[in-house]
Amino acid sequence: ISNKYNSVTFGKNILIGKNVKIGSNTSIGNNTTIEQNVYVGKNCLIGSNITIKNTIIGDNVVVQDGCKIGVKGFGFVPLKDKNFRFPHIGRVLLNNNVELGANCTIDRGSIGDTVIGENTFLDNQVHMAHNVKIGKNCMIAGQVGFAGSTTVGNNVSIGGQAGISGHLNIGN
């Protein structure tokens, strides 16, 4: 049995932080955490066992089970004999009509934002590092990994298990 409030359906064991806004006709699955200052648009389907931080989600977005969105990226600065983690203060922006397959991990930006364009679909287990930008109408197959600060244009398809190095610009 689920709970419904203002046309939003909530599963069991959900944690919602302060200043979270959730649009109408959205469904949130069991054991999902939405941390403070997250915006979720209308007509979204947010699955179970998901963590969302530092993220703005557009309308008609599907996030399948197990995704981690807006987590801290892997960014370090080597100084003398130690590595120091640099801050990740950016966000994740999921535009309208985006779909994330199960167990995707989308890191928030270090200073700017990590962005997925409208009508873009990610298959299961895709990883996007900090500051990656994917254009509109892209299809990304399973187990693709994007290293930090890579930009992908519009209407791009990427086959399964591809590894994309950091700081690249892939055109339309």
Q: Where do the language-model regions lie?
A:
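Structural signal for interior beta-strand "rungs" in well-ordered beta-sheet cores
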Residues: S2-N172
